[in-house]
């Protein structure tokens, strides 16, 4: 449950501060966040991980945008602006991602989602 995540989140933040390093933590989203729209989930959709959203300096969520693209949302940025969306293309043959524009992502969606 969420109470078990709070001390973990706090410890991750303490380690990051004391070692002056960045830590990447992955969290599952709840069912409400896994909706049918194309937009990525929001911070409130972090499943049992409210503390991660509160303790984090940056929260980026992602969602599949068709078969070959991903859409990301900068949901929280403690040191700057947030709310930006950005897109990437996925290359399944080597597992790499490449940043692309929304127009390019839309074209990929049209091309590969018909297969």
Regions found by a protein language model. Name each.
Residues 2, 6-20, 31-115:
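C-terminal regions of RecA-like/P-loop NTPase motor modules
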Residues 27:
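H-loop/switch region of ABC-family ATPase nucleotide-binding domains
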């Amino acid at each position: 449950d969420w109470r078990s995540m709070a001390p973990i989140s706090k410890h991750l933040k303490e380690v990051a501060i004391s070692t002056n390093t960045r830590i990447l933590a992955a969290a599952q989203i709840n069912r409400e966040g896994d909706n049918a729209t194309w937009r990525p989930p929001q911070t409130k959709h972090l499943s049992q991980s409210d503390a991660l959203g509160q303790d984090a300096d940056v929260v980026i969520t992602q969602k599949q945008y068709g078969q070959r693209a991903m859409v990301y949302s900068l949901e929280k940025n403690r040191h700057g602006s947030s709310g930006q969306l950005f897109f990437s293309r996925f290359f399944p043959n080597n597992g790499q991602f490449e940043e692309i524009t929304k127009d390019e992502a839309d074209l990929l969606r049209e091309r590969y989602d018909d297969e």
